Amino acid sequence: IAERGQSLSRAGYNQYGFGQHTRTLGDVQALYVQLGKTVRRLRLKLGWTQDVMADRSGLHRAHIGEIERGQTNVTLQTLKTLADALNVRITDLLKGL
């Protein structure tokens, strides 16, 4: 992980070998916005309105709108629900994040 003679922390890793990344609130918000754009793009590719997406996913239409605008935290369960409704993998929703 670290180059010879370089400490783990200087190489950007903690004691367990995991990267030490500090994200700001703005960084996290940008991830949710990008996720929302991906969900919207995939929904529109299927020709679905938010109402149809709500019916297919079991999520409330207003919640789908919040997700697409990046205005809400998205749980792993919600990611799975969205992926299943859109017939994609969770990783497809997370590409580019």
What do the predicted segments below correspond to?
Residues 1-28, 84, 94-97:
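Short, charged recognition helix plus adjacent turn
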Residues 75-92:
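DNA major-groove recognition helix of helix-turn-helix/homeodomain DNA-binding modules
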Residues 58-72:
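Recognition helix of helix-turn-helix/homeodomain-like DNA-binding domains
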Residues 39, 53-54, 64-67, 93:
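Conserved hydrophobic/aromatic packing and binding residues within compact polymer-binding modules
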Residues 21-45:
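A short, Lys/Arg-rich alpha-helix, primarily the initiator
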